[in-house]
């Protein structure tokens, strides 16, 4: 077990573990300064930047949580798309981080049909579960290539998947089509830039969660496991905080619970709370442009 490393200006920690830490930070793109085995201000700043990037507690202290993230295997299923698993508190998280200029996000599924995400995601680098649904219809506004197959809901926000613009509640498919939107999905609650309460009390507690975030250059898909001894689950405000620390400026909650799922490189990487895949009407697929 590696020691906890932290910064004290009057006595700088040093040694082989610090050297290893500096090497790992440099390999992950966070400049620790000179790799000299001394935990100085430059190395602490690199730790802070790393903690923000992976969505763990940002305190500059290299304890068990940060060591776990440092030594986690970050996997790249294709240029511009990274996958990482990390733990924060008592919850396991799964993250896809995509470059907008290299990765396209497609709406998967067929109207009035429930399918496993693994079936819908064939041929894609990665995929996540999508919109809330009732029977076989997604709830909210969904447009794919200008066609809709959803049950609209006035309390759902909508994101344009081509231009990555977030629309407030109440925009109908017809209104969005007039705005030039061709591909969009809906969800709730809005998480960023400000976090709203969900419209259902059943969504306010801790549980398996799924969310989509983005900024000017990146897309973040985040899934949290829950309802198990291995992972307590997350609240939507906690999902918002993780996405904010990752750098997202906008974020939207998606269907969670037993539906929350992430696929990377052809396999489910999280642990759906039902113990198996739950069929759903649609999902989101990530592929190279």
Q: How would you label these PLM feature ranges?
A:
Residues 22, 47-50:
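Conserved hydrophobic/aromatic packing and binding residues within compact polymer-binding modules
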Residues 25-29, 51-58, 74, 131, ...:
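Sec/Tat-exported extracytoplasmic proteins
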Residues 38-44:
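Phosphopantetheine-attachment site and its flanking helix in carrier
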Residues 44, 64-67:
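Short, well-ordered surface patches within globular domains
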Residues 68-289:
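Gly/Ser/Thr/Pro-rich low-complexity, intrinsically disordered segments
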């Amino acid at each position: 077990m590696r020691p906890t490393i932290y910064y004290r200006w009057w006595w700088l920690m040093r040694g082989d573990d610090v050297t290893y830490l500096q090497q790992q930070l440099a390999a992950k793109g966070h400049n620790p300064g000179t790799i000299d085995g001394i935990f100085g201000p430059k190395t602490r700043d690199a730790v802070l930047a790393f903690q923000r990037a992976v969505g763990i507690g940002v305190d500059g202290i290299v304890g068990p949580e940060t060591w776990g993230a440092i030594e986690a295997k970050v996997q790249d299923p294709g240029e511009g798309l990274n996958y990482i698993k990390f733990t924060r508190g008592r919850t396991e998280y799964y993250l896809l981080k995509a470059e907008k200029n290299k990765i396209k996000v497609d709406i998967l599924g067929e109207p009035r049909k429930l399918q496993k995400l693994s079936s819908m995601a064939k041929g894609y680098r990665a995929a996540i579960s999508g919109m809330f649904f009732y029977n076989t219809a997604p709830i909210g506004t969904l447009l794919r290539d200008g066609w809709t197959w959803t049950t609209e809901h006035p309390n759902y926000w909508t994101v344009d998947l081509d231009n990555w613009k977030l629309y407030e509640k109440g925009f109908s498919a017809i209104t969005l089509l007039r705005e030039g939107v061709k591909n969009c999905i809906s969800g709730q609650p809005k998480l960023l830039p400000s976090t709203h309460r969900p419209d259902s009390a059943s969504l306010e507690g801790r549980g398996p969660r799924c969310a989509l975030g983005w900024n000017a250059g990146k897309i973040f898909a985040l899934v949290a496991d829950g309802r198990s001894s291995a992972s307590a689950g997350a609240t939507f405000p906690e999902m918002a905080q993780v996405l904010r620390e990752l750098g997202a400026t906008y974020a939207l909650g998606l269907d969670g619970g037993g539906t929350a799922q992430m696929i990377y490189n052809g396999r489910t990487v999280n642990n759906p709370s039902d113990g198996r895949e739950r069929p759903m009407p649609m999902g989101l697929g990530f592929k190279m442009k």
